[in-house]
Structure formats: structure tokens, C-alpha cells
Amino acid sequence: MSTTSEIIEKLKTLTLLEAAELVSQIEETFGVDASAPVGGGMVMAVGDAGGAAEEVAEKTTFDVVVEDIPSDKRVAVLKVIRKLTSLGLAEVKAFTNSLPGTLQEGISKEEAETAKTELEAAGAVVKIA
């Protein structure tokens, strides 16, 4: 039996809790986000009688993802999140208890950079996706 087949058979025996734990460990180990969409962003253009040329479409909308908030910086980050969004205090607390999470979606690069700068200044770990 090949290594891949052995791994698949082993995965079939995992409980839902074990599978979720495995996903978390894979995300940590390899620095990936399992919830991030795969692919996209590539556009194929047909050239003149010479074949096909690939070009990468420039991304125009961005998401601000809060990865982590140190416990000693939580209050400062909560204030910044409330300033950046229309969320109430209870919603912001719920959001920060379920990190990582997308705070803003489909915004311009400038808005995303501004939000990232403000959140990082308050102590949050942030990435732009």
C-alpha cells in the first residue's frame, strides 16, 4: 500500500474533533489557512496566432484578517475594531473570541493597509488577504 493510501485510510478513522485538531496543526506547521479559497487570480489571454499568454489579474479588493490579539492588548484592539467597523461591543468581543477571523472584506488596498496599521499599533497580529 502506498504512503498516500495509508494516510487516507488513517484519516478515515479520525473523529470530527481529531480532524479539526489535525487541520489546526497543519495550519500552524505549514503557515496556511484552510479557510482561504484556493486558485483564482489567474487570467488566460489568447495571443495572436502565436499561442496563449498568461497574465496575472491585479487584485483590487482585500480582506483584513485578525490572526491574534495578546491578552494585555485586548482592550486597545477592541476600541480600534469598534472604530473601524459598525459592530457593537458584544459583537466585537464575540469576534475576538473566535480568532483568526476576517474583520473587513472586499475593501480597497488603502483601506486595508490603514486598518492593518491601526490594528497592529494597538497590538493585534493582522494580515491582508
Swiss-Prot record:
UniProt GO BP: translation
Subcellular location(s) per record: Plastid, Chloroplast
Tree of life domain: Eukaryota
Gene Ontology annotations for the cellular component aspect, listed alphabetically: chloroplast; ribonucleoprotein complex; ribosome
Gene3D superfamilies membership: 3.30.1390.10, Single helix bin
Subunit and partners: Homodimer. Part of the ribosomal stalk of the 50S ribosomal subunit. Forms a multimeric L10(L12)X complex, where L10 forms an elongated spine to which 2 to 4 L12 dimers bind in a sequential fashion. Binds GTP-bound translation factors.
PANTHER family the UniProt entry points to: 39S RIBOSOMAL PROTEIN L12, LARGE RIBOSOMAL SUBUNIT PROTEIN BL12M
Entry function: Forms part of the ribosomal stalk which helps the ribosome interact with GTP-bound translation factors. Is thus essential for accurate translation.
Family to which the UniProt record says this protein belongs: Belongs to the bacterial ribosomal protein bL12 family.
Name of protein: Large ribosomal subunit protein bL12c
Species whose genome carries this gene: Oltmannsiellopsis viridis (Marine flagellate)
Origin organism lineage: Eukaryota, Viridiplantae, Chlorophyta, Ulvophyceae, Oltmannsiellopsidales
Gene field: rpl12
